[in-house]
From Swiss-Prot:
It comes from Streptococcus pyogenes serotype M49 (strain NZ131). One of its GO terms (cellular component) is cytosol. Heterodimer of AddA and AddB/RexB. Belongs to the helicase family. AddA subfamily. PANTHER family: ATP-DEPENDENT HELICASE_NUCLEASE SUBUNIT A, UVRD / RECB / PCRA DNA HELICASE FAMILY MEMBER. Keywords: ATP-binding, DNA damage, DNA repair, DNA-binding, Exonuclease, Helicase, Hydrolase, Isomerase, Nuclease, Nucleotide-binding. The lineage of its organism: Bacteria, Bacillati, Bacillota, Bacilli, Lactobacillales. GO terms for molecular function: 3'-5' DNA helicase activity; 3'-5' exonuclease activity; ATP binding; ATP hydrolysis activity; double-stranded DNA binding. Disulfide bonds: none annotated. ATP binds at residues 60-67. This is ATP-dependent helicase/nuclease subunit A. Its cofactor is Mg(2+). Residues 39-495 form the UvrD-like helicase ATP-binding domain.
Length: 1222
């Protein structure tokens, strides 16, 4: 029950319905199932919307309507008396928050329109007003609110700013690192610190590798709940724990034993093949068979009796025994077919080889790790201190401040917990541990609502941890008192062809080991409607592979990315879709794993005339030509003796010096000086005192004088003005901004130049001043091989979309092409010199000196890089985590498609036909095989090979060069402009025929367009009505004339000395008033008088307006109340322009006008027009203005592609306002 106050100050009591019990929810589910609605909510959706009083985890598969569920749940909470500001709603992006807010707003407007309860209308209107203040946004945005409000409690000023520019962060980091590095090099433990630096950088002069290590450790720690505690307690966890063979995790031993047993099984399967050759011609066992049987028996025995024969302490001995047993090669050949039986086992043995030696030297690296721990802790504290001094922080800092505020201030934490009725989280699978801690502090322990899908967790590079979701999933399934799991499996997005291939692929690929979740019946996609199950044979998924057997070298290697041939395959399929099926370009989307080869795709599509829009490429802003020219201009202004920058400026279009000019200048040196800069030579050339003054001709001298004069002016400006003004001065004085407008990609180039000025302005506003510091900042960004974000420009809508898989998340497209499926997964991180893990801490490659072990006496040292045990442990986990993320990326990419999905890659047809595995083992691909395959394409081919007897819902097709010729690819069909059959019969001579045609054309034009000669090309509805009304509506004219003559009232003459107010002026004033009138306030005389002051009319006209009549319209008519209820949908005094065809001349003309008011809804439009004409009967004005409203309706329909369902005239010329529907 809720109490509100009405306008009279009286309490309004609203009785809200209680939350539904489990029995009521079941009843609602049954009613929904039996209803005849075309679109029904699923039982699980209803459960997710209405279940309350406990923690809820909604596992929502792709396309299952999770946003719909969230919006409906929020609306249900509001309708049951929970104010919107008592809900905490976290989204992953700002865009998602905006969309969610808009959906809630639309739902509230719809609910207001449906309800007849006035008190409920008032309450819902209040919720609308509170919506903009509600906590709907990202975790970063909420953390900023907390710190802005309560930062004082931990000593943080509320007047902070966010450092979003990575370049600024890098500059500060570099300053802190350099100072700290010097301190550590001069401390007592300097020898240990030098050894630490050398272990990663090779020498103490080049600190880049060590700096990267420190920065990475710092960034990793920032994603934890408490960075300082993690660095102190977890950073060296594995280094302290794993120091003996007995410390090796059981899981790693199990994987080794599993690889041994799998090898024995695969070898047995191979030896059982008919063509293997177990026996010799004499009938005895062959030597090969005997050897392989021995391997099978020993591997099986060692696995079975591992604990008795070896145990963990004897692991090193087991590795030696297995290494000596199996052959050094990977393959066993049968009938010229190679089977990689030993490949996986060799990889596992490599992991465990030299364990005793590694453990012997591993203890020597522990002092180095302690030094690293101290350095990273000191760096974290010093960097934070600098940011506090600057009052500028990163998002992670703000989040940790918010956590600290809530942890250390019980009253603040409890106030939040008591305030929030529910803590709701979208995209829960992408949370990190810092965010999870913040959510835990906001919740009261039983009011969390989490929506996500672990199969779509693809942000590990942002330290997102899918195990947070996974752990909740397991806990809630085992311990129902902690919370409830609800599965949304129905997919409402894709046709069965997409759903079937997705289920087929991931049921063979994804489990807890790789993918972090078993893709079983719980997680498989189910069509949500009957329409999705209708089969389309031409929409079966396709794996299209360019056959690289005869690759002519045009294709780059895997590391380089996609080849021209692969893109041509895509172009061919798109041309076929567009020409044969009429598929518009905007229905087609290309997905890539990275943007590195977008240029090849765009270039190829341009060749075939296919329009394409990309979501950006690599960040190359600072490397764009126009920006480099301007940066060199600024460098020259700062220091003219910078020869590189000066030459670039002289050669630029601003001054246009050519090679000959520069050569002549270069010869003007001073023989007495050993080193002479170009700027000095220019000055000597101008005054004629160079070594060869005769080389400076008049034209060159004039160019030099102009240059020196301009440079002097710029340098003076740099001392007096801001960076922003200086850059704009550079643009315009030498017309460079105008010059780039004439070049290719002019719009992008001009946007880049203007963005440079804006970034300089932002740089100065952040507290830095001066041209020198700005150039230094830019140079540091370039030194760190970073760049600034590219500038976005407007893109065409009717074009194929090209974007990364990450960017496509949450979107859907009819046709999806997944490109570059042959691209190897990036395993760069597992080959670095260090690997971080949240639980185990850091593992490193240690550069050990094994001089003593080898007995070497000649050399000073013998350094060998060793993978320490913590490193190997982290490496294995990271490898599986990387493969899992790639698998989820493939899932996201495939489930974006509505109708059809294509996989594009390249492979050798002959090699791909080799059998991957001799035997199908269970439903999943063997774990060892999934670990071994490192491309989407390899996974798909392995599934197609091993499970070839199943219908996998995708076809594999190899494309040859002969399929990619110009004729085979085809070209886009364009509408034919001329029909050859319509050409004039050529029976007469060409001259006579042309003369007759000209005479006929002139006569026809004069006849057809006679009316157009006397009519304007731009007309208004009033002009149109006056011109054609007698022709189009003669009956209506007669009625009006008769009715006007039958009026019996006679108005007495008015003899006032005041000037008469024209009716048109009153009408204009009424329209102005209706435009500016604030509808959010109650409409009364005071509101009208306040609004009246703001219109542009004289006092006589304002006095002539009947405000009581206007008040009556809003208070006493349903249409007036409609204005106030749906004010968010209202557009007032909207201009329009449409093309019309003149009925007499058949010539097109522009019709312009202004629509008084219209309401724009999702599926229809309501049109309103005010009239102040005097009338006797409303039917008169209805007939008079019917055509005018039809024109307005036509304009709105053309603009929005929606029907105008209602058209109203508001008549203000009578005794009271009247509403007439036309």
């Amino acid at each position: 029950m809720l109490f509100n106050i009405n306008e009279k100050g009286e309490p309004l009591v609203i009785s809200f319905a209680p939350f539904l019990s489990p029995e009521a929810i079941k009843h609602l589910q049954e009613n929904e199932r039996c209803s005849d609605q075309s679109q029904k909510r699923t039982a699980q959706q209803i459960e997710a919307i209405y279940t309350s009083g406990q923690n809820i985890l909604v596992s929502a598969s792709a396309g299952s309507g999770k946003t719909f569920v969230m919006v409906e749940r929020i609306l249900d909470k509001i309708l049951r008396g929970v104010s919107i500001d008592r809900l905490f709603i976290s989204t992953f992006t700002v865009k998602a928050a905006t969309e969610l807010r808009e959906r809630i707003e639309n739902k509230l407007y719809s609910q207001i329109a449906q309800t007849t309860d006035f008190q409920m209308k008032v309450y819902l209107t209040e919720q609308l007003q509170s919506l903009c203040q509600a906590d709907i946004g990202t975790m970063d945005a909420f953390a900023q609110k907390v710190v802005s409000r309560y930062g004082y409690s931990i000593g943080i000023s509320s007047q902070f700013r966010i450092m979003q520019d990575k370049a600024e962060q890098d500059v500060l980091k570099q300053e802190v690192f350099s100072k700290l590095f010097s301190e550590f090099m001069n401390q007592k433990e300097a020898p240990v610190f030098r050894a630490l630096v050398k272990n990663f950088s090779g020498n103490c002069k080049d600190t880049s590798a060590f700096r990267e290590l420190v920065y990475t450790c710092y960034s990793f720690s920032q994603s934890t709940e408490n960075p300082k505690i993690w660095l102190q307690e977890n950073f060296l966890s594995a280094a302290k724990t794993y120091q003996r063979l007995e410390d090796i995790p059981d899981h790693d031993i199990e994987l080794l034993l599993l690889a041994m047993q799998d090898t024995a099984n695969q070898l047995r399967d191979v030896t059982d093949m008919e063509d293997y050759g177990q026996l010799t011609k004499a009938g005895s066992r062959s030597a090969k068979y005997t050897k392989h049987l021995t391997i099978i028996e020993k591997l099986s025995d060692w696995v079975r009796d591992f604990k008795c024969l070896y145990g963990k302490a004897g692991l090193d001995r087991l590795i030696r025994d297995v290494t000596g047993l199996i052959p050094s090669g990977n393959d066993v050949t049968v009938s010229k077919v190679k089977y990689p039986v030993f490949k996986t086992l060799h990889q596992k043995l490599k992991q465990f080889r030299h364990l005793e030696t590694i453990l012997m030297y591993q203890k020597d690296c522990f002092p180095l790790l302690e030094q690293l721990q101290d350095f990273v802790l000191a760096f974290s504290e010093a960097y934070l201190a600098v940011k506090i001094q600057e009052s500028a922080f990163e998002f992670s800092d703000i989040a940790h401040f918010a956590i600290k505020i809530l942890e250390e201030n019980t009253d603040i934490r409890q106030s939040y917990q008591q305030h929030y009725h529910e803590v709701m989280v979208d995209e829960y699978q992408d949370n990190n541990h810092m965010q999870e801690r913040l959510l835990t502090l906001l919740s009261n322990g039983h009011n969390r609502f989490m929506v996500g899908d672990i199969k779509q967790s693809i942000y590990r590079f942002r330290q997102a941890d899918p195990q947070i979701f996974n752990q909740k999933f397991r806990d809630y399934q085992k311990k129902t008192e902690q919370g409830k799991v609800i599965l949304l499996k129905e997919n409402f997005r894709s046709q069965s062809e997409v759903l079937n291939v997705s289920n087929a692929v991931f049921s063979h690929l994804m489990d807890e080991s790789v993918g972090d979740v078993l893709y079983d019946e719980q997680h498989q996609l189910i069509a949500g409607s009957h329409a999705q199950t209708v089969p389309y044979l031409d929409r079966r998924a396709q794996l299209l592979l360019y056959n690289s057997d005869k690759d002519d070298g045009n294709a780059p290697s895997d590391s380089e990315g996609i080849s021209f041939s692969e893109v041509t395959i895509v172009a061919k399929e798109i041309i076929k879709l567009h020409n044969d099926k009429g598929v518009p370009f905007e229905d087609i989307t290309l997905l890539v794993s990275s943007r590195t080869r977008n240029d090849i795709i765009s270039h190829t599509f341009n060749q075939y005339g296919i329009p394409i829009v990309t979501d950006g490429g690599q960040q190359n802003y600072l490397k764009s030509v126009e920006v480099m020219v301007m940066l060199d201009t600024l460098r020259t202004i700062n220091n003219p003796r910078n020869d590189y920058a000066l030459v670039a400026l002289l050669r630029s279009p601003m001054f246009a010096f050519d090679e000959d000019d520069l050569a002549r200048i270069a010869l003007q040196k001073d023989n007495e000086l050993d080193k002479d800069c170009l700027y000095d030579k220019i000055q000597r050339a101008v005054i004629g005192r160079g070594a060869y003054p005769e080389l400076i001709h008049d034209t060159l001298l004039g160019k030099l004088n102009v240059f020196l004069k301009t440079l002097k002016s710029w340098r003076r400006y740099a001392k007096l003005g801001s960076l922003y003004d200086l850059i704009l001065e550079n643009f315009h004085e030498r017309f460079y901004f105008d010059f780039v407008a004439s070049q290719a990609k002019a719009e992008q180039a001009q946007a880049n130049l203007y963005a440079l000025a804006l970034r300089a302005n932002q740089f100065e506003k952040s507290g830095y001043k001066g041209l020198y510091r700005f150039i230094k900042m830019i140079d540091k960004v370039l030194e760190t091989q970073n760049d600034l974000a590219d500038v976005e420009v407007a893109t065409p809508k009717q074009a194929v979309n090209l974007m990364t898989i990450h960017k496509s998340k949450g979107l859907q497209f009819p046709y999806v092409f997944i490109l570059n499926c042959d691209k190897r997964f990036s395993m760069t991180d597992i080959h670095k010199s260090f690997i971080l893990n949240r639980q185990h801490g850091i593992g490193i490659k240690y550069l050990a000196d094994i001089k003593g072990l080898l007995g070497e006496t000649t050399l000073n040292s013998v350094k060998v890089s060793m993978e320490t045990l913590p490193y190997q442990l982290n490496k294995q986990e990271l490898r599986l985590a990387t493969l899992s993320e790639e698998m989820r990326l493939l899932y996201v990419a495939m489930t974006r498609a509505e109708k059809k999905v294509y996989f594009i890659g390249k492979a050798s047809k002959s090699k791909s036909q080799e059998i991957t595995d001799p035997k199908k083992l269970g439903k999943l691909l063997p774990l060892a095989l999934r670990e071994q395959l490192l491309t989407f394409q390899d996974w798909l081919l392995a599934i197609a090979d091993i499970f070839s007897t199943e219908d996998l819902y995708f076809d594999v097709r190899f494309i040859e060069d002969s399929d990619l010729t110009q004729e085979s690819v085809g070209r886009l069909q364009t509408p034919q402009l001329l029909n050859p059959d319509d050409l004039k019969d050529n029976r007469q001579s060409e001259t006579i025929a042309r003369a007759l045609d000209m005479l006929e054309a002139v006569s026809q034009l004069n006849a057809n367009y006679e009316a157009a000669i006397h009519l304007p090309t731009v007309r208004t509805p009033s002009q149109l009505k006056a011109t054609y009304e007698p022709l189009l509506e003669p009956i209506g004219v007669d009625i009006i004339e008769k009715s006007s003559r039958s009026l019996s009232d006679f108005t007495l003459p008015h003899f006032s000395k005041k000037a008469k107010v024209e009716a048109s002026h009153i009408g204009s004033a009424l329209h102005q008033l209706m435009q500016v009138l604030p509808l959010s306030k109650p409409i009364n005389q005071q509101t009208l008088l306040d609004a009246l002051r703001g219109i542009d009319s004289n006092e006589e006209v304002k006095t002539a307006l009947d405000l009581k009549k206007i008040e009556s319209f809003f208070c006493d008519t349903s249409l007036g109340q409609f204005f106030q209820t749906y004010q968010k949908h209202l557009y007032r005094e909207a201009p329009f322009a449409i093309l019309k065809l003149d009925p007499i001349s058949q010539e097109e003309y522009v019709l312009r006008g202004i629509i008084d008011a219209y309401f724009l809804f999702d599926d229809h439009i309501v049109l309103v027009d005010y009239k102040t004409d005097k009338y006797k009967q409303p039917i008169e004005l209805k007939k008079r203005y019917q055509q005018q409203l039809e024109l307005y309706a036509e304009a709105l329909t053309q603009t929005y592609k929606l029907p105008v369902t209602k058209r109203y005239l508001v008549l203000m010329g009578g005794g009271k306002p009247e509403i007439v529907e036309v």
